[in-house]
Amino acid sequence: MEDKRVAMLVVMMLVMGNMLIEAEAVMSFKLCYGGCLVACALIAPPIKKLFCPFLCIKDCKRRPMLSFEANLNEIDQTGSYCELGCATDRCVSSSSIDDKGYYVNFSGIMWRKFHYAWIHAQKSAPTRTKIAIDFSL
């Protein structure tokens, strides 16, 4: 009984942590700049505190716009779907019974096709980034 409670607690913490990261990623420029300025004022050495506003502007402006921050009417996701579908189709088309005797050559071909599909899947997948504040000059 105790193991189930611990497992439920761990799952709940993972879900809440994921929600926290999602909420943190949607931060606007004002929130990013304010938090960065406070953190810089508390952490940076006295001489570098003069550069805090400039460092924070640089770090908060550099933050990429995430896919869910963009206007959803302007996003055309059919191109991404077609790239991923085309890449997957190229991988699947090589896996037939006729290739059974050519395992060495076939594995090399499949590796190249898998690599191609992986690259296109990474291009079409939305990315999650965390911005790190760099206090070094």
UniProtKB/Swiss-Prot annotation:
From the Swiss-Prot or TrEMBL record, state where the protein is found: Secreted
The yes or no answer to whether the keyword Amino-acid biosynthesis is present is no
Has UniProt tagged this entry with the keyword Protease?
A: no
User: Which is a Gene Ontology cellular component entry for this protein?
Assistant: extracellular region
Q: Where is the signal peptide?
A: 1-23
According to its UniProt entry, one GO biological process term is: defense response
Q: Which organism is this protein's natural source?
A: Arabidopsis thaliana (Mouse-ear cress)
The record's family statement is:
Belongs to the plant thionin (TC 1.C.44) family.
Q: What is this protein called?
A: Thionin-like protein 1
Posttranslational mods = Is disulfide-linked.
Q: Which UniProt key words apply to this protein?
A: Disulfide bond, Plant defense, Secreted, Signal
User: What does the protein in this record do?
Assistant: May be involved in plant defense.
